[in-house]
């Protein structure tokens, strides 16, 4: 029987999660039926969703025999919106913990991009016994860069897009989001803009969250040595959102970790170099 590609609509699910005395309706996609589960956590860009972030990576993981969970973090996608005054990554980690508890999944492999990487570190620090392997892409530490003025050019454009969600600002951000912009089609821009504008509450609440606490992503650097999970770090050589030395900091802080740097690659390695990225991750997950 030939493999049937996963679709967003067929795998769409919702669960209610309690957070700070409130009930949040959280959206996720549940793909495949493997014995091992890989959770994919998206970044913080306006209009981001689990599915949009990892659309080029889902089928290879499912075909390899993994169950794949794609979470829409609160404030993104079809999940409820929220104003967050604490650590955004710890919030995402708590939400994920509740979701996998309700799904009765004892242990997960975590694969996170940007904010998703930082949230994966938060989850691992809080519940290390629940984590199999860890893949961190373009995020995970927080803190300052040794070589790049902060906030970076990319983060400045991202914040501008949140405050003024126009097609012009979206193109300005995406122009430095990836290394090769030839794949940035009008259809992609239109889909991303529609995602953003369909949930203006997400955009407004992200800005309110930054105003309540500008440091939504705290520095986990001093605690990286606590991580014992096998860890693969992936970075784009030309990342203009999170500097490459953040990846070196992860490599130095997490014992036994390894770092793969893609050349001609921006902040979206899993999309820009999808085939090579997928093989890299599958080899890592299959390794004893």
Swiss-Prot record:
Pathway(s) served: Aromatic compound metabolism; 3-phenylpropanoate degradation
Pfam family, one: Abhydrolase_1
Keywords: Aromatic hydrocarbons catabolism, Hydrolase
Keyword NAD: no
Residues annotated as the enzyme's active site: 267
MF annotations from Gene Ontology: 2-hydroxy-6-oxonona-2,4,7-trienedioate hydrolase activity; 2-hydroxy-6-oxonona-2,4-dienedioate hydrolase activity; protein homodimerization activity
Catalytic activity entry: (2Z,4E)-2-hydroxy-6-oxonona-2,4-dienedioate + H2O = (2Z)-2-hydroxypenta-2,4-dienoate + succinate + H(+); (2Z,4E,7E)-2-hydroxy-6-oxonona-2,4,7-trienedioate + H2O = (2Z)-2-hydroxypenta-2,4-dienoate + fumarate + H(+)
Catalytic role in ketonization of the dienol substrate (substrate destabilization), annotated site positions: 192
GO cellular component, one term: cytoplasm
Residue(s) at site: Transition state stabilizer: 114
InterPro entries linked: AB_hydrolase_1, AB_hydrolase_fold, Epox_hydrolase-like, MhpC_alpha/beta_hydrolase
E.C. number(s) listed in UniProt: 3.7.1.14
Enzyme class, spelled out: hydrolase
GO biological process terms on file: 3-phenylpropionate catabolic process
Every AB hydrolase-1 domain range: 38-273
Keyword Hydrolase attached: yes
Subunit structure: Homodimer.
UniProt similarity note: Belongs to the AB hydrolase superfamily. MhpC family.
Function: Catalyzes the cleavage of the C5-C6 bond of 2-hydroxy-6-oxononadienedioate and 2-hydroxy-6-oxononatrienedioate, a dienol ring fission product of the bacterial meta-cleavage pathway for degradation of phenylpropionic acid.
Protein name: 2-hydroxy-6-oxononadienedioate/2-hydroxy-6-oxononatrienedioate hydrolase
Organism, as annotated: Escherichia coli O157:H7
Gene that this polypeptide is encoded by: mhpC
């Amino acid at each position: 029987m030939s493999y049937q590609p996963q679709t967003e609509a067929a795998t769409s699910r919702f669960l209610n999660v309690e957070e700070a005395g409130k009930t949040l309706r959280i959206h996720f996609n549940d793909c495949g039926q493997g014995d091992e589960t890989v959770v994919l956590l998206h970044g913080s860009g306006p209009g981001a969703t689990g599915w949009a972030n990892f659309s080029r990576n889902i089928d290879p993981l499912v075909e390899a025999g993994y169950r794949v969970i794609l979470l829409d973090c609160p404030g993104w996608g079809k999940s409820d919106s929220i104003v967050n005054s604490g650590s955004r990554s710890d919030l995402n980690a708590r939400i994920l913990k509740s979701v996998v508890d309700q799904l009765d999944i004892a242990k997960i492999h975590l694969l996170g991009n940007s904010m998703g990487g930082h949230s994966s570190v938060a989850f691992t620090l809080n519940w290390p016994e629940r984590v199999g392997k860890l893949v961190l892409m373009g995020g995970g530490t927080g803190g300052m860069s040794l070589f790049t003025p902060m906030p970076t050019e990319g983060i400045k454009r991202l914040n501008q897009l949140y405050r003024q969600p126009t097609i012009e600002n979206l193109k300005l951000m995406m122009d430095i989001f990836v290394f090769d912009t030839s794949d940035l089609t009008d259809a992609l821009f239109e889909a991303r803009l529609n995602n953003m504008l369909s949930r203006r509450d997400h955009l407004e609440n992200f800005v309110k969250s930054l105003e309540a606490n500008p440091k939504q992503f705290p520095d986990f650097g001093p605690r990286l040595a606590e991580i014992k999970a096998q860890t693969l770090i992936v970075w784009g050589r030309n990342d203009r959102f999170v500097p490459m030395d953040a990846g070196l900091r992860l490599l130095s802080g997490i014992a036994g970790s390894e770092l793969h740097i893609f050349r001609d690659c921006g902040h979206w390695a899993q999309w820009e170099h999808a085939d090579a990225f997928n093989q890299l991750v599958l080899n890592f997950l299959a390794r004893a």
